[in-house]
Regions:
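AMP-binding/adenylate-forming catalytic core of the ANL superfamily
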Residues: 12, 16-17, 22-26, 33-34, ...
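Acidic/polar alpha-helix N-cap and adjacent early helical turns
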Residues: 162-170
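General small-molecule cofactor/ligand-binding pocket signal
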Residues: 141-144
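Short, solvent-exposed helix-helix connector turns and helix-capping sites enriched
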Residues: 5-6, 26-27, 156
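Conserved adenylate-forming
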Residues: 1-10
Length: 170
């Protein structure tokens, strides 16, 4: 574990200390990977990636396991989702990567619109353009009547990716 210098722009893995569990029940491998000791201090590594801003605040980027690689650039779905969810027509959104012959993956937004709302891809991209780099903008927009979430309320990226692939005829 090495701290990240504030304002450096370096992406690192979030680490937490304090009241940390002893481990996962009957899962020593996962416990070893998640809970580490360094200099007598116990740390938890939940799997989230983050940067430290110049003012010392932490910017959560999301989990590396759902990171989209498009043209060698990393896109964290949660970052794009937070911008999309600010659009007045969007009730909820998940962002996934689908295969792209040129870029490796392309960004797809799976969105649930508010009742009576309409939204086209161009308008969604224009809205996002104010806050996101061009490579992070959704290249496809898949509209659904509701977004699936896990029993714990977490984003179901597997469902969103399958839905996007089916909708885009992959």
């Amino acid at each position: 574990l090495r701290p990240i210098a504030p304002g450096s722009g370096v992406v690192g893995q979030l680490a937490r200390r304090g009241h940390i569990p002893l481990g996962y029940y009957k899962d020593p491998d996962k416990s070893r990977a998640t809970f580490v000791s360094l200099g007598g201090v116990r740390w938890a590594l939940p799997g989230d990636l983050a940067t430290v801003e110049a003012d010392g605040s932490v910017q959560l980027l999301g989990r590396g396991s759902v990171c989209i690689n498009t043209g060698g650039e990393k896109v964290f779905p949660e970052e794009v989702e937070s911008v999309l969810k600010a659009h007045p027509a969007i009730f909820d959104a998940l962002v996934v990567g689908v295969p792209d012959a040129r870029w490796g993956e392309r960004v797809v937004a799976v969105v649930q619109l508010r009742a009576g709302a309409a939204l086209e891809l161009g308008a969604a991209r224009e809205f996002c353009r104010e806050q996101l780099a061009a490579y992070k903008l959704p290249r496809e927009l898949v509209r659904v009547t509701h977004l699936e979430r896990t029993a714990a309320g977490k984003a179901d990226y597997r469902w969103a990716k399958q839905t996007a692939l089916a909708s885009l005829a992959f």
